[in-house]
Amino acid sequence: MVSFTTLLAGFVAVTGVLSAPTETVEVVDVEKRQTIGPGTGFNNGYYYSYWNDGHSGVTYTNGAGGSFSVNWANSGNFVGGKGWNPGSSSRVINFSGSYNPNGNSYLSVYGWSKNPLIEYYIVENFGTYNPSTGTTKLGEVTSDGSVYDIYRTQRVNQPSIIGTATFYQYWSVRRNHAPAARSRLRTTSNAWRNLGLTLGTLDYQIIAVEGYFSSGNANINVS
């Protein structure tokens, strides 16, 4: 995550890993709270996705409803979170909780569309690395009083939800970090469309915590 290329390779790889929950961390109410290995699926009414690059030091836990937690220490690259599948361009996503990164990390709305194949991010908070570094700003949008800067990048022959492909990535990066916020997908998607950045049919859409060789903890609730 020192660069877009390194970061996004970790993000994209989420889509290629499938496994089932492996172990509960509580004897009581195990259906509502589970520590899991890498994988995707549904938990307590929400879609989840969790991937890591094989390094130890990351614990991802699905909680009740839309809640999840991540604890990481001297980890490699990972990304995990909860949301919906399919996504919606008109959804209003509320999230709250605590997010305490020490180093490179992001808290974002993350998802994909097909036809066209697009990978997109609405970055609400980040640690020491701003994902807009080294890119050209296309515009900005204001949502609920916060300003987001808009960028587009391209990935060539990289993993995606349909296999190896070449595709664009859309980015909206919030200027003021938010530990809790409301993300209005319609506002963002309209701003992207006005800049010629169109989305296709939406695939999964989650609030994701990502880290790259860093430490920290997060307890997030999505609704």
Swiss-Prot record:
Signal sequence region: 1-19
Annotated catalysed reactions: Endohydrolysis of (1->4)-beta-D-xylosidic linkages in xylans
Residues in GH11 domain copies: 34-223
Family annotation (PROSITE patterns): GH11_1 (PS00776), GH11_2 (PS00777), GH11_3 (PS51761)
Enzyme class: hydrolase
GO molecular function: endo-1,4-beta-xylanase activity
Major localization class: secreted
Family label: Belongs to the glycosyl hydrolase 11 (cellulase G) family.
Keyword terms, alphabetized: Carbohydrate metabolism, Glycoprotein, Glycosidase, Hydrolase, Polysaccharide degradation, Secreted, Signal, Xylan degradation
Top-rank taxon: Eukaryota
Assembly notes: Interactc with tomato LeEix2 receptor to trigger its internalization.
Pathway field: Glycan degradation; xylan degradation
Residues bearing glycans: 94
GO annotation, biological process: xylan catabolic process
Function per UniProt: Endo-1,4-beta-xylanase involved in the hydrolysis of xylan, a major structural heterogeneous polysaccharide found in plant biomass representing the second most abundant polysaccharide in the biosphere, after cellulose. Acts as an elicitor of plant defense responses in hosts such as tobacco (Nicotiana tabacum) or tomato (Solanum lycopersicum). Induces the production of ethylene and leads alterations in membrane function with rapid efflux of potassium, uptake of calcium, alkalization of the medium, increased leakage of cellular components and necrosis in plant hosts.
Active-site residues per Swiss-Prot or TrEMBL entry: 119, 210
InterPro entries: ConA-like_dom_sf, GH11/12, GH11_AS_1, GH11_AS_2, GH11_dom, Glyco_hydro_11
EC number annotated for this UniProt entry: 3.2.1.8
Name of encoding gene: EIX
Localization per Swiss-Prot or TrEMBL: Secreted
Keyword Secreted part of the UniProt annotation: yes
Protein name: Ethylene-inducing xylanase
